[in-house]
Curated annotation (Swiss-Prot):
Positions on the Extracellular side per record topology: 20-547
Membrane-spanning intervals of the chain: 548-569
Catalyzed chemical reaction(s): L-tyrosyl-[protein] + ATP = O-phospho-L-tyrosyl-[protein] + ADP + H(+)
Entries under Pfam families matching the protein: EphA2_TM, Ephrin_lbd, Ephrin_rec_like, fn3, PK_Tyr_Ser-Thr, SAM_2
Protein known as: Ephrin type-A receptor 4
UniProt keyword annotation of tRNA-binding present: no
All copies of domain Protein kinase, residue ranges: 621-882
Organism: Gallus gallus
PANTHER family: EPH RECEPTOR A5, EPHRIN TYPE-A RECEPTOR 4
Protein family membership: Belongs to the protein kinase superfamily. Tyr protein kinase family. Ephrin receptor subfamily.
Limits of the Fibronectin type-III domain: 328-439, 440-537
Keyword annotations from UniProtKB, A to Z: ATP-binding, Cell adhesion, Cell membrane, Developmental protein, Endosome, Glycoprotein, Kinase, Membrane, Neurogenesis, Nucleotide-binding, Phosphoprotein, Receptor, Repeat, Signal, Transferase, Transmembrane, Transmembrane helix, Tyrosine-protein kinase
Location, primary (coarse class): membrane
Amino acid sequence: MAGVPVGALLPLLVGVCGAVTGSRVYPANEVTLLDSRSVQGELGWIASPLEGGWEEVSIMDEKNTPIRTYQVCNVMEPSQNNWLRTDWIPREGAQRVYIEIKFTLRDCNSLPGVMGTCKETFNLYYYESNNDKERFIRESQFAKIDTIAADESFTQVDIGDRIMKLNTEVRDVGPLSKKGFYLAFQDVGACIALVSVRVFYKKCPLTVRNLAQFPDTITGADTSSLVEVRGSCVNNSEEKDVPKMYCGADGEWLVPIGNCLCNAGYEERNGECQACKIGYYKALSTDVACAKCPPHSYSIWEGSTSCTCDRGFFRAENDAASMPCTRPPSAPQNLISNVNETSVNLEWSAPQNKGGRDDISYNVVCKRCGAGEPSHCRSCGSGVHFSPQQNGLKTTKVSITDLLAHTNYTFEVWAVNGVSKHNPSQDQAVSVTVTTNQAAPSPIALIQAKEITRHSVALAWLEPDRPNGVILEYEVKYYEKDQNERSYRIVKTASRNTDIKGLNPLTSYVFHVRARTAAGYGDFSGPFEFTTNTVPSPIIGDGTNPTVLLVSVAGSVVLVVILIAAFVISRRRSKYSKAKQEADEEKHLNQGVRTYVDPFTYEDPNQAVREFAKEIDASCIKIEKVIGVGEFGEVCSGRLKVPGKREICVAIKTLKAGYTDKQRRDFLSEASIMGQFDHPNIIHLEGVVTKCKPVMIITEYMENGSLDAFLRKNDGRFTVIQLVGMLRGIGSGMKYLSDMSYVHRDLAARNILVNSNLVCKVSDFGMSRVLEDDPEAAYTTRGGKIPIRWTAPEAIAYRKFTSASDVWSYGIVMWEVMSYGERPYWDMSNQDVIKAIEEGYRLPPPMDCPIALHQLMLDCWQKERSDRPKFGQIVNMLDKLIRNPNSLKRTGSESSRPSTALLDPSSPEFSAVVSVSDWLQAIKMERYKDNFTAAGYTTLEAVVHMNQDDLARIGITAITHQNKILSSVQAMRSQMQQMHGRMVPV
């Protein structure tokens, strides 16, 4: 070192080294990339020039640990340019690094004769590189970071006094992008010693905030940048809001956002989620601590989410986990009864122990017990009424009415709360036994007219529901409707029927009936109105002259012959005779023909069930398996064994629990309807179960299920005769219903059931008469939705359901049967179906469908309902086809499957057109004449082979026009194949 001996600096450097090696603990947010004090052995940095510039000096500290330093002190010579370069320093992902330099510098004023050449600064450079083996210093590659000046410099006196003047400077550089970099120190004439060089970058260290752990994160490239970091929840916790923090450029975490919550059964302790201790619990993921188990409960495991109730205590379903466990209440106290004829009033006091709950209510159980045999009791049944209600009472009194006279009753009053069902016990009830007094009979529910003539009405009625003793006699009160009870007559009878004679013809009379026992008369029934006839009925009785009888019979025969002849003549004029009166307006009853009675006309629907359906003891029924689910409950198969009869298989419809009175009434209405029918092609009602739960409807069991599914499952397996036989059975059943003036309204293959002998039976009689306005034309009813595709046009437009609309539906069923269960109108929407039918389109014949059957379908689909055949005519026609199988051999299509285009009855006769132009003009599609000509379709023989793709290819894209053309094409094709006649004479 020119001008200043190196030895003069060594004592001072030893002191300095002792100071800098005392501690090497750095902040947690700093990651060291290079620390010259930690290098074992020589640093081996490259100096330029190799000699006369920077020198590496090794000095021992007080622990005899070598400290490697670099010195330079060429203060005597001008124009110094001494470079010192570090080894390659890996970046390790840092975008900004910091250089900490500890150094000493000689005061130029303390050196004589160097004022022109001595400097008190040096320069710091860096160079980014992916090459860690560069051997030479290329000054032009380096970029200057800063000029470094000393805050304090030392003199010769300081050396003598061993005064330490160590400088520390920190500089940063970035952003960095390559794998590593080199640092360089340029001396321009200073007397300097580099004691240590440390290169580091800053990070935000791993930390836990709000139960979220944030990993070590390197700071951003700029001194003001913030790095967003998403945290992860610690063990046994879950996110409430997404946990985030920002890592600042100084390595400090800023702005915590979001947090995690300890899972159920865990609480926050010392920044962790630790399990709840024994005897504590936590039910939800919240930020609260574990809570001690509420009264009458405990936990025996760490991490409990709830506490177990003590023996005899319970928790209701809606009770929070924080609520104490409770128990059922004790029995009500001080039960008092007051009997008034066939009514009883009960009052009681609240139980002594409410079980720790406030939701106390009361249930009353009524039992009818035999005299002297209190242990032989049975439920009072549904005929007894409770006011305000039987169960869920909030008051401590109840009135019970409609009891039987002179009968022993036991009433139990149960106190219940939210946990009673977990441990029901007789300890929760108090009972009282009473005997009712004598009482008058209850009102009669129903009066029927068995026969009405010009001057008389034959009445019959059932015994009152509660006779309350022996009925001594009945009293009938009647009067003309117009008199409004101002003038009435009384007739008394000991039987439950009577003939009221001497009435005026064509007059409405109102009748009331009441019963009398030893306790007196009961109330009159409600009014029942009947109207006498205008024409006298023929009477043939004892003493009638045989000659007169013979003449009457002969006259009747002649009259029948005349009527038949008139019908034949009329039949020749019209295919089917038009009805003189709409079917739904025919109200007169033919003598000897049973007529359907609508159960909804009964004031008490239960009376209709009792009248038309047989009550079956539930013990006679064995349910075997569930075969389906209906609107009201499950449908099961099972067996019925009635005493004295053989066991049979049955289908069982059940009414699901929790039903309303309306649901029960609607459910049983189907039984009231079915019970009136007796025909081999109508599903047979075996009976009902109404006196216990579940309420059930029992019908015969049909092994093959619904007709549509059965046909799809057996596609193509039946002969045409077999299919026609099925249709004949359905038609026969519908004729029977029509003769009884019953309109089905929902005739479809899905509502026809098939037994093991392929006998088809009409079912599903639960359909409502109430239809909603629905723009989608799918009317909602109590029995489900009626698709438009089965419904006659007048029923859609005017809600006019008649036997004629059932005939339309029967035609659709015929199509379903012959197509083996295909969906009518395929995937067309309801609105498209309505529009197509209105425009005169009809379904084409299914594959291999005989012409005669398709013609019968088209007859059923006549727009005018009076033009449609009656069910009797349909059955006769099917009988003729069955007797003449050859008539079923001619089919309307030779294709493997029918076209999905509807048939248009307005299609022209093939024989009436001779060219494509004539044909297009006939169907009003002449606008497409050029399209056909350009595509080469110049003859009708070529046209009849076209399909929908062909039409689209020649430029006909409108769906309605495609359908119209294709329907006419199909009709022409059929005419060619059949040799005569049109296929769709609608």
